[in-house]
């Protein structure tokens, strides 16, 4: 007798690959429950931002009221607030980290000014300039220009004043140059005015002026016949002619004789 072997029929409840149908059902449900990305409208974002500006952690009642107002679920509103708080913290952290870094490049771009070691401090320079200005002002009040010009070499009478001597010493200390006894730099800054020589040249010019003045006065007196001419030899002084123009009479005896003859 021959026997035929038939394979067993596949039943619907048989397992396939050691996986039951319940496993597929659970996975399908999990995949189906995954949420999609929500796209908010402009009006919804404005309402959410307004509430976030008031409080970062709204309570459940506020979230439900807001969800009903903008036509969303309370879960969507809660997720939006969580994401918004995370974004706000990230922005604040980035701003705090950027502040020290922004100051350092500024310090590198603008280094501190290099000051010469031999130069005085800025405070001393300002003080010296102020003292020089005060000395010049006091000099202008005490001495002042005597005419339309103010020479740089002043007479000896002005050099003897205490104020002018103090100003000269201060100017010499500022400029650092040697000063002679008579030729000094102009403390008033009148370099455009005519300058004069030293004491010897000034004395010679004064003597020349006096000599010319004396000669002029002598010439005036000679023209008025008040003094004799310097070129003529010494002799009797000539008397001036009478105002009526008549000749001078020689003696009283001749006058008497002429009068007798005329009679």
Swiss-Prot record:
Keywords of this entry: Developmental protein, DNA-binding, Homeobox, Nucleus, Transcription, Transcription regulation
Superkingdom, taxonomy of origin: Eukaryota
InterPro entries registered for this protein in UniProt: HD, Homeobox_CS, Homeodomain-like_sf, OAR_dom, Paired_Homeobox_TFs
Coiled-coil features, chain-numbered ranges: none
GO biological process, any: axon guidance
Residues annotated to bind DNA: 33-92
Biased composition (Pro residues): 110-123
Compartments (UniProt record): Nucleus
Main location: nucleus
Biased composition (Polar residues): 220-234
MF-aspect GO terms: DNA-binding transcription factor activity, RNA polymerase II-specific; RNA polymerase II transcription regulatory region sequence-specific DNA binding; sequence-specific double-stranded DNA binding
Bias (Basic and acidic residues) ranges: 89-106, 251-263
GO cellular component: chromatin; nucleus
PROSITE patterns hit by this protein: HOMEOBOX_1, HOMEOBOX_2, OAR
Residue numbers covered by motif OAR: 204-217
Chain residue ranges for the region called Disordered: 88-138, 220-263
Known role: Transcription factor required for the formation of correct projections from nociceptive sensory neurons to the dorsal horn of the spinal cord and normal perception of pain.
Subunit composition and interactions: Interacts with RGMB.
Protein family (similarity comment): Belongs to the paired homeobox family.
PANTHER family: DORSAL ROOT GANGLIA HOMEOBOX PROTEIN, HOMEOBOX PROTEIN ARISTALESS
Name recorded for this polypeptide: Dorsal root ganglia homeobox protein
Record organism: Homo sapiens (Human)
Phylogenetic placement of the source organism: Eukaryota, Metazoa, Chordata, Craniata, Vertebrata
Gene coding for it: DRGX
């Amino acid at each position: 007798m021959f026997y035929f072997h038939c394979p067993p029929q596949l039943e619907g409840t048989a397992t396939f690959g050691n996986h039951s149908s319940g496993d597929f059902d659970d996975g399908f449900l999990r995949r189906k429950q995954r949420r999609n990305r929500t796209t908010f409208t402009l009006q919804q974002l404005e309402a959410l931002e307004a509430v976030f500006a008031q409080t970062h952690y709204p309570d459940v009642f506020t979230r439900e009221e807001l969800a009903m107002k903008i036509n969303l679920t309370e879960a969507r509103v809660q997720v939006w607030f969580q994401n918004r708080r995370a974004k706000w913290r990230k922005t604040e952290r980035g701003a705090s980290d950027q502040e020290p870094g922004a100051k350092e490049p500024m310090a590198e771009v603008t280094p501190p000014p290099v000051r010469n070691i031999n130069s005085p401090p800025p405070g001393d320079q300002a003080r010296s300039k102020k003292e020089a200005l005060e000395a010049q002002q006091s000099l202008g009040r005490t001495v002042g220009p005597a005419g339309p010009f103010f020479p740089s070499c002043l007479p000896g009478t002005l050099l003897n004043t205490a104020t002018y001597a103090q100003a000269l010493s201060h100017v010499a200390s500022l400029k650092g140059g040697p000063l002679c006894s008579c030729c000094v730099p102009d403390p008033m800054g009148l370099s455009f005015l005519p300058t004069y020589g030293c004491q010897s040249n000034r004395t010679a010019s004064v003597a020349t002026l006096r000599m010319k003045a004396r000669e002029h006065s002598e010439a005036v007196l000679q023209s008025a016949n008040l003094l004799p001419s310097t070129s003529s030899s010494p002799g009797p002084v000539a008397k001036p002619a009478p105002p009526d123009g008549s000749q001078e009479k020689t003696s009283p005896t001749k006058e008497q004789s002429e009068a007798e003859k005329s009679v």
